[in-house]
């Protein structure tokens, strides 16, 4: 049987990335909560910066 989690970085970025979070009011709330908590990474895409 095929497992349900089939990871793809593009899909991960597009669904949970920084710009996606900024697009909605609740997403911005998520980011501000993570800033307030002092998270090292705010979102998925901030970790996956291309060099």
From Swiss-Prot:
One of its GO terms (biological process) is translation. GO terms for cellular component: ribonucleoprotein complex; ribosome. Residues 42-51 have a biased composition (Polar residues). Belongs to the bacterial ribosomal protein bL34 family. It comes from Chlorobium chlorochromatii (strain CaD3). Disulfide bonds: none annotated. The lineage of its organism: Bacteria, Pseudomonadati, Chlorobiota, Chlorobiia, Chlorobiales. Residues 1-51 are annotated as: Disordered. The gene is rpmH. One of its GO terms (molecular function) is structural constituent of ribosome. Signal peptide: none annotated. Gene3D superfamilies: 1.10.287.3980. This is Large ribosomal subunit protein bL34. It comes from the Bacteria. HAMAP family: Ribosomal_bL34 (MF_00391). Residues 1-19, 26-40 have a biased composition (Basic residues). Keywords: Ribonucleoprotein, Ribosomal protein. PROSITE patterns: RIBOSOMAL_L34 (PS00784).
């Amino acid at each position: 049987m095929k497992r349900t989690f089939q990871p793809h970085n593009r899909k991960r970025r597009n669904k949970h990335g920084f710009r996606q979070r900024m697009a909605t009011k609740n997403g911005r709330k998520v980011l501000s909560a993570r800033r307030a908590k002092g998270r090292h990474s705010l979102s998925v895409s901030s970790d996956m910066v291309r060099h």
